[in-house]
Every structure is written in structure tokens, then in C-alpha cells.
């Protein structure tokens, strides 16, 4: 657990948990942003797998058990699940790959490009990663990237996976909060810049997988969505 300069009582709660259960480790640091906090956690992490949880969301009590079981039973390097999107009193299941499936890296890439901007693929918190892959590739989060650093991390991680397991069960509660990333012109500009950067990562990934010629039209669909976002904001 990383306390990234919190100002409420959450640090004390985490400290009590760390005392009560040695599996929990607490790191306190001055506020440096989400990427710095995640990188600090990766440096301290041990064990076989990595799982991320945002501080103001919730996970299903059986989330970790379910994801680890899928990884072990299927020999997967990446496991991802459906999730709940919670907006006030409303709760909806979100996901993309249907049913329980085991996919090769190329098969997964073909599924991902069908919905390249989908949270299901871009976020960290509905996934389980092998720590050995993260460390062998030296993967860390880009501190200078203001938004979408998790998507870039995922696109880099996928390069090294052999098999991907999809679990259709929703195991995470993503709490929708007031406000929008594109509510101001400044954040809109950052969003567009991030989408352009993500497009470059996408293009490089599909070229490395020898899928670019096959999937070129779908890859460029992501870039076109960026142009549409800019046009509709004028």
C-alpha cells in the first residue's frame, strides 16, 4: 500500500492493517502522482503476481483468488475480467471478450483492436500480471504522462505474454466520479495528445506481432476517433 501524501485518515487505517497482517506493507511518500506511487509499489513488490487497486474503488472478495486460479490453471501470463461500473445508485457490468477463453497473444490482439479505447483493455485494475515479466522488461509507469499511463503499460506488457485468460465474471467495482477528463480545453488537449501517443504504441505493437497489415484499418480507427474528438470540441 502506497500513501501518496494522503490528507485524510486512510494512512492510519493502512498502518493498522500492516501491523495486523505482515502480508501488507505500507510506504508513505510525499504526493508525487499516481505513476510515482505505482512505481514505488513495483519496487517493493514480491511474489509471483501483480494486481492493482485504485484507492477509491472496491474489489470483489474473491477477485484475487479467481484471477490467480485462472492464471495457474490455464498457464496465462495475463488474466483480465469483467467489472462493475458504478455511477451513484446505478451499477452495470462492463467487459468485451465473451465467455471464459484462453487466447494466444495474436488472438488477444485481434480482440483488442475491435475496441481499442475500451476500459476493459486499457486499465490496470481488472487484470493480473506476472511480476517476472514486468521486471524482466523493466516496465514502469511514465511519470510525465498525465493520463493513460496504464494503457501504455498494458501495451508494452502484451509484447511479452504468451497466453491471455479472459474471465467473464465481474470482479472489480469501478466507482464513477463527478467530472470528466475532457471537461476543460486543457484536459481535452492532454486527452488528444495521449490518444496520439497511444496510437503510436498500438501501431508498433501490431507491427511487432506481424498483424499490422491485417489490422491496419482498425488500428487507424483509434486515430480517427481522436480527430473526431478534436472536431466536436471546436
Specify the residue positions occupied by each region the protein language model found:
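Conserved small/polar residues in nucleotide/adenosyl-binding loops
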Residues: 231-234
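Amphipathic alpha-helical repeat scaffolds of TPR domains
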Residues: 220-228
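Short, conserved active-site loop motifs that form the nucleotide-linked donor/cofactor pocket
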Residues: 24
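A conserved acidic beta->alpha catalytic loop
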Residues: 3-12
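Glycine-rich, basic loop-to-helix element that forms the pyrophosphate-binding segment
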Residues: 29-45
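Short aromatic/hydrophobic "clamp" motif used to bind/position activated sugar donors
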Residues: 50
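Active-site acidic Asp-centered loop
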Residues: 4, 53-55
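Donor-binding/catalytic cores of nucleotide-activated saccharide
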Residues: 34, 55-165, 172-190
